[in-house]
Amino acid sequence: MSKTRVYELAQQMGIDNKELMAKLAAVGVEVKNHMAAIDDADIKKLSAPATVKEVSQEEVRVKPTLIRRRAKVVEAVAEEPPVEPKAEPAPAEVTTEKVAEKARVEEAPAPEAPVQAAEPVKIATEEAVPERATANKAKILGRVEIPGLTQRAKPPVQREAQPTARVVERPEARPSAERPAPGQRPEGQRPGQRPEGGYRPAGPRPAGQRPEGPRPGYTERPVTRGPERPGQARGPERPAPVVPLEMPPAGEDRRKGRKGKEVAGAGKKGPAGAAVPKRKEEFKKTELFEKHERVFEPGPRGKGKKRQAEKIQIGKKTEITVPKAIKRIIKISETITVGELAKRMGIKANDLIRALMKMGVMATINHALDFDTATILATDFGYEIENVALDIDEILESTPDTPESLVKRPPVVTIMGHVDHGKTSLLDAIRQTNVIAGEAGGITQHIGAYDVTLNGRKITFLDTPGHEAFTAMRARGAKVTDIVILVVAADDGVMPQTREAVNHSKAAGVPIIVAVNKIDKPEAKPERVKQELMELGLVSEEWGGETIFVDVSAKKRVNLPTLLEMVLLQADVLELKANEDKAARGTIVEAKLDKGRGPVATVLVQEGTLKVGDYFVAGIHFGRVRAMQNDRAEKVLSAGPSMPVEVIGFTGVPDAGDVFVALADEKQAKEIASLRQQKVRETELAKHSKLSLEQLYEKIQMGEVKDLNTIVKGDVQGSVEAVSESLRKLSTDAIRLNVIHASVGAITETDVNLATASNAIILGFNVRPEVKAQALAEKEGVDIRLYNIIYDAVDDIKKAMEGLLEPTLREKFLGRAEVRETFSVPKHGTVAGSYVLDGKMIRNSQVRLLRDNVVVFEGKMGSLRRFKDDVKEVASGYECGISIENYNDIKVGDIIESFEMEKVATKL
């Protein structure tokens, strides 16, 4: 059996929830609130009385209509008007009897209906008494059900039913009798007897409790329900007395009666022609009445109706639309977050996360998706992804030069080689300056760019570090150079970094000139160097190859002019040219943060001319050239191709190796830098957030991985990069080293606060902490390590990482004794009289009992005695008494080994 909610039924009936609950209580159905569910049986109980009322109302006019239908319409109309005036004085008792008689007559077959034509007049007269109207409603209804036409006559009877009170109990309602009635409804019997105009004047009279104007019109609606209205002329059937009887005494009762009729009428099944017009007209009148009531009777009921109307509108089913094809294309840059993609597709982020998990990717709403992943996801949901990322490199691509615009430029020479083979000493000798004096430990820590003039021709030199940590810097040096001078010590030969330099140069397609240094030493063997380099593909010209070899001594300044002549000769062969009349373009050789000047970068101009005041972009930073100076700290206003200059005016410290491009205006430079910054952020986010289910499972299986966080500060960007990369290489499966921050400049309070929050160590490379930062570090217990040689930094970090590892336990052998006799001692158990064979027996040490070289027991020594005296240890060659804790099964001939477990620090 289906159940219906109270509020749903109220909406169907067009009444308020409270009114419906009151009606349910009246028929004996108890409900707690508007959300309660009621059965169909209870709904039938509720609808029964409403049906009866309508039948009783229709009953009164059945007879007149029948007369009309039998072509005696005029007579019926003529009889009613004189009878109605008598309705008011008629006594109530007579009304009851006559009503009963009418019911009996109605039970007769339909053909006898014309005989009953006179009775309607009597009924109308008697019903004019409103005093007993309410009590007799039900009884009259029962009688009316029998004839088919009675349902049409309901409106008049309802007027009588409300005054009459007690006759209702006699007849029983017969639903079967009501069925035939609908068949006769469409004959247009009601229209003539239910004139709407007649009710208007009677409106003010019956208003009892509510004298408002809208009430007469309101009562009119139930009467108009029947389809009889259009059938007859309204003039003759306007009985003034009938109208007042129809109006309920109270406004609330009228409302209930009207709505009950509406619901009942909606449920009746009659000919289509009769039902449709009735509903249309009634709906329009209801709207008019509600509008009137909202204006003149504002109150909870009016509000309730308004709410109902709103609910009906809200409940309308919305049409699901599909975006146009052009709207199903989502434009993204390199990456997009899950939340942003879901927002653009108009779906929930959880759906995307679920789809990603099916693909084996653990993701959150802030997870960054690359273009390919986003494309796969969007395709599953019917969308397309379009990559609209600007190709900045294409925008900044340099325009080709015409042969006429090219002029000769100085060669850029990079000096490379193994650590401590004399690269900087050679450059120092060439420049005749003491560059090496300032380098800690004799190791070049950053790239230097220098301009040297020889015989009126300029040569630009780049000095690169030889330490293994500076591989990236050597690779960059090889890319921007024209010629490489490979320095090899004659007394040391080819070393690992020598091979690396050769590989970098070959990869860049740069010609190599080999400078065999330190030939002034007695142990120098230049021929061995040539032989070793030949294995790397560098064959000397003397041996039929193409590689130039020059034996030099930087210390004694031997053959330096010859080396420079070879450089110029190689440059002439290469025919190095560049266009000076265009926007400058170059490479960042080195960058640092100067306390007085801000970010400063060494720029090697490769084409065009850089002038003071030019706007530029380099990596993720932009700026304007405020000032320039050469390697000798002299201010310059412009710099042409192959000229290294220090540029002041950056917004931040660029990375070594970034491309430097001069632009027309600041707006363009700022826009490009912003796009690059956004791209870097998205890439970093994607890098850190990628974690598949398999990787997650592996991490869980491996257990806890210990982290060592570090903050690296250096004097120049190249050194910071080198140190950071060296530290990252120290990570192992057991311990992971994270460089959480790396920048140039002194150690500040911000760095200390970051180290405090992340439990990190601060490494300073050629920098010192500020006074406040030092005090804060001591207060917070932050470890600050300062270095000027990269070897020391790497070694200390290794030690720190080893300290994080769990120490390993190692067994240390102490001594061995042979059991020669056993004794049973109270409170000590069995004591073994033993002879120490080697080592020494130490009290409270760990012991192992061996029998036939098989371990029988392992535990702790209970006591150690010598001649009844407790001793700390017994050396080899002496006798002693030994007891073992919680073990007494000691036999002659057993061997007792003494040992201890010591913790040993784990090495990486």
Curated annotation (Swiss-Prot):
Span list, region Disordered: 145-312
Region (G3) residue spans: 463-466
Tagged with keyword GTP-binding: yes
GO MF assignments: GTP binding; GTPase activity; translation initiation factor activity
Biased composition range(s): Low complexity: 194-217, 263-276
Keyword Cytoplasm among UniProt keywords: yes
Biological function: One of the essential components for the initiation of protein synthesis. Protects formylmethionyl-tRNA from spontaneous hydrolysis and promotes its binding to the 30S ribosomal subunits. Also involved in the hydrolysis of GTP during the formation of the 70S ribosomal complex.
Ranges where the tr-type G domain occurs: 408-577
Residue sites binding GTP per the record: 417-424, 463-467, 517-520
Family under the similarity heading: Belongs to the TRAFAC class translation factor GTPase superfamily. Classic translation factor GTPase family. IF-2 subfamily.
Region (G5): 553-555
A Pfam family per the record: EF-G_D2
Region described as G2: spans on this chain: 442-446
Name of the molecule in the record: Translation initiation factor IF-2
Taxon lineage: Bacteria, Pseudomonadati, Thermodesulfobacteriota, Desulfuromonadia, Geobacterales
InterPro entries xref list: EF-G-like_DII, EFTu-like_2, IF2_II, IF2_N, P-loop_NTPase, Small_GTP-bd, T_Tr_GTP-bd_dom, TF_IF2_bacterial-like
Cellular compartments annotated: Cytoplasm
Region (G1): 417-424
Main location: cytoplasm
Keywords noted in UniProt: Cytoplasm, GTP-binding, Initiation factor, Nucleotide-binding, Protein biosynthesis
Stretches with biased composition (Basic and acidic residues): 167-177, 278-296
Region G4, annotated ranges: 517-520
